[in-house]
Amino acid sequence: MQKLIIFALVVLCVGSEAKTFTRCGLVHELRKHGFEENLMRNWVCLVEHESSRDTSKTNTNRNGSKDYGLFQINDRYWCSKGASPGKDCNVKCSDLLTDDITKAAKCAKKIYKRHRFDAWYGWKNHCQGSLPDISSC
């Protein structure tokens, strides 16, 4: 019985671990979450320069705010550091750090709808006019 409980805990922990995507793995995941094909190279570039395709990535900014996950979503405006979902995306920041990118994708699309790619410095500084090749994906 004790072995069964330990096995169940291991399975639960593995299911919520972070993930680092390959470039094509990221493309497939973004397609699965309904990202527009005509913007795909922009999204891939953004994610590569913001988080290196790592869902567990965090970054503390000079102003004390923190960015979370694949899309480096900021806690000042978009996600709540507390135990309850909140802010503009109505999501907990910790939910943006798992291998299930559903909530992160939904929030990133909301940010894009409001600010386009200009909301992300990784895109502004690295992706304008220089997008990755995803033709083999």
UniProtKB/Swiss-Prot annotation:
Signal sequence residues: 1-18
Active site per UniProt: E50, D67
Catalytic reactions on record: Hydrolysis of (1->4)-beta-linkages between N-acetylmuramic acid and N-acetyl-D-glucosamine residues in a peptidoglycan and between N-acetyl-D-glucosamine residues in chitodextrins
Taxonomic classification: Eukaryota, Metazoa, Ecdysozoa, Arthropoda, Hexapoda
Key words, A-Z: Antibiotic, Antimicrobial, Bacteriolytic enzyme, Disulfide bond, Glycosidase, Hydrolase, Signal
Record's function text: Lysozymes have primarily a bacteriolytic function; those in tissues and body fluids are associated with the monocyte-macrophage system and enhance the activity of immunoagents. Active against E.coli and M.luteus.
Disulphides: C24-C137, C45-C127, C79-C93, C89-C107
Entry's EC annotation: 3.2.1.17
Transmembrane region(s): none
GO biological process, one term: defense response to bacterium
Full protein name: Lysozyme
EC class: hydrolase
Induction note: By bacterial infection.
An example molecular function term from Gene Ontology annotations: lysozyme activity
Family according to the record: Belongs to the glycosyl hydrolase 22 family.
Pfam family of the protein (one): Lys
InterPro entries assigned to the protein according to its UniProt record, in alphabetical order: Glyco_hydro_22, Glyco_hydro_22_CS, Glyco_hydro_22_lys, Lysozyme-like_dom_sf
C-type lysozyme domain span: 19-137
UniProt cross-references to Gene3D superfamilies, sorted A to Z: 1.10.530.10
